[in-house]
Curated annotation (Swiss-Prot):
Disulfide bonds: none annotated. This is UDP-N-acetylmuramate--L-alanine ligase. Pfam families: Mur_ligase, Mur_ligase_C, Mur_ligase_M. One of its GO terms (biological process) is regulation of cell shape. GO terms for molecular function: ATP binding; UDP-N-acetylmuramate-L-alanine ligase activity. Pathway: Cell wall biogenesis; peptidoglycan biosynthesis.
């Protein structure tokens, strides 16, 4: 369910008692964590228990398992994620009571109020770049508040309240959320057509980034990765309009001489350079920022090492767009060395697979062995014409090196049957495929 953002969003300390529907998700849990740190009364509900819910309880949140209208009594504001359906009993009850109901983006804007916001946007690389900028600023002596779409390995959390005036935030373009943040500065990693179920056309999608850049403070700045045509064009347009614009390129990595990053891959190098440039524009010393980049050990589900068993290394990543798939397979190839890359890919959303399924399959051709799962539906309805078979059929590898496995519980065994000592197994996708890696390790250990 997508809710409109109110024309005026109150600061978080004026929202009263806040209840999150879907509090365990990556987006809402971080906002809840920041509100709790500010002394705001927080409650929430989710369908299943998790370590995230345990952590929020320990911070003082009242968390319910399951959804019930009774959970929103004595609540002033309801915050919902896009995964919440219109018939959710808590949402229905909040509307009946006339409570303030906010989408995730408005709740994030509420906790940003009064801070100097650096918003990180782009089709790919938002989470990694936001993470890199956060650790770089911390190393340089800043203590920013941050909200990221994944858990930082160094802290184990996806958000934290800082003592400084900076707020580093991942800015999601999928539903237009990033148009409501009014940041001081922004980083744009790339612009490539995606979320066309929301935007309709590639042109409308790209135009949203222009509108986003127009929301920056007059004395703020824009950092763009010039390796990407869309981001480079955005930089040129806004430089011509008088905006302070900085461009970076992975082809000019001299600023990071002597810095060993946590993962190979040109896209990760570009992310690090963008973070460095933003930190310098904020007034911090490049050497201090680079020290932070060198200390970065990753973010959950971004080329995350899950373990090794039977001589097989297992990694997991969130990549679900063709460009992201290609980038992470490049990185996996570098990590694998002389070993082969065996990938399990779970297409994400019927709407995305319908548009990009063939391109996904072509990108997967950079692996040595490919297992394609069925489409992870999330909030969408199935379409018998759009399944994982569409992706598998487009992989440019011999048939014996590609498998479409619709039975989720059979995927781990299929990967183990294909992997050999020295190989790297990589699970890719934004859905439940992340659970496959531990199963593979368990089978290899057994």
């Amino acid at each position: 369910m997508r809710l409109p953002v109110p024309d005026q969003v109150l600061p978080a300390d004026r929202l009263g008692r806040v209840h999150f529907v879907g509090i365990g998700g990556a987006g809402l849990s971080g906002i809840a964590r920041i509100m709790l740190a500010r002394g705001i009364t927080v409650s929430g509900s989710d369908g299943t228990d998790s370590p995230t819910l345990t952590a929020l309880r320990e911070l003082g949140a009242r968390v319910h398992l399951g959804h019930d209208a009774a959970h929103v009594h004595d609540v002033d504001t309801l915050v919902v994620s896009t995964a919440v359906r219109e018939d959710n009993p808590e949402y229905v009850e909040a509307v009946r009571q006339g409570l303030r109901v906010l989408p995730r983006s408005a709740a994030l804007a509420a906790v940003m109020a009064g801070r100097r916001v650096v918003a990180v946007a782009g089709t790919h690389g938002k989470t990694t770049t936001t993470s890199l900028l956060t650790v770089a600023l911390q190393a340089a002596g800043a203590d920013p508040t941050y909200a990221i779409g994944g858990d930082l390995a160094a802290t184990g959390v996806n958000a934290a309240e800082g003592t400084g005036d900076l707020f580093v935030a991942e800015a999601d373009e999928s539903d237009g959320a990033f148009l409501h943040y009014s940041p001081y500065a922004a980083v744009v990693t790339n612009i490539e057509a995606d979320h066309l179920d929301q935007w309709g056309t590639p042109e409308a999608y790209a135009a949203a980034f222009d509108e986003f850049a127009d929301t920056l403070a007059p004395d703020g700045f824009l950092v763009c990765v010039a390796d990407d045509p869309g981001a480079a064009a955005l930089a040129e347009r806004h430089r011509a309009a008088g905006r302070r614009v900085v461009t970076v390129s992975a082809r000019d990595a001299g600023a990071l001489d002597g810095v060993t990053l946590w993962s190979p891959g040109e896209h990760y190098l570009a992310d690090a350079l963008a973070a460095l440039a933003a930190g310098v524009e904020l007034g911090y010393a490049a050497a201090d920022l680079a020290r932070g980049l060198a200390s970065y050990t990753g973010t959950k589900r971004r080329m995350e090492r899950k373990g090794e068993a039977g001589g097989v290394r297992v990694y997991d990543s969130y990549a679900h767009h063709p460009t992201e798939i290609a980038g992470d397979l490049q990185a996996a190839r570098a990590v694998a060395g002389s070993g082969r890359v065996v990938v399990a890919f779970q297409p994400h959303l019927v709407s995305r697979t319908r548009i990009f399924g063939t391109a996904m399959g072509r990108a997967l051709g950079a692996a040595d062995e490919v297992v394609v799962l069925d489409v992870y539906l999330a909030r969408e309805d199935p379409d018998p014409e759009v399944t994982g078979a569409l992706v598998a059929g487009a992989v440019p590898l011999p048939a014996e090196r590609v498998a479409y496995v619709a039975d989720f519980d059979a995927v781990a065994a299929e990967l183990v049957a294909r992997a050999r000592p020295g190989d790297l197994v990589l699970t890719l996708g934004a859905g439940t495929v992340t659970a496959i890696g531990p199963r593979v390790l368990g089978l290899l250990d057994g």
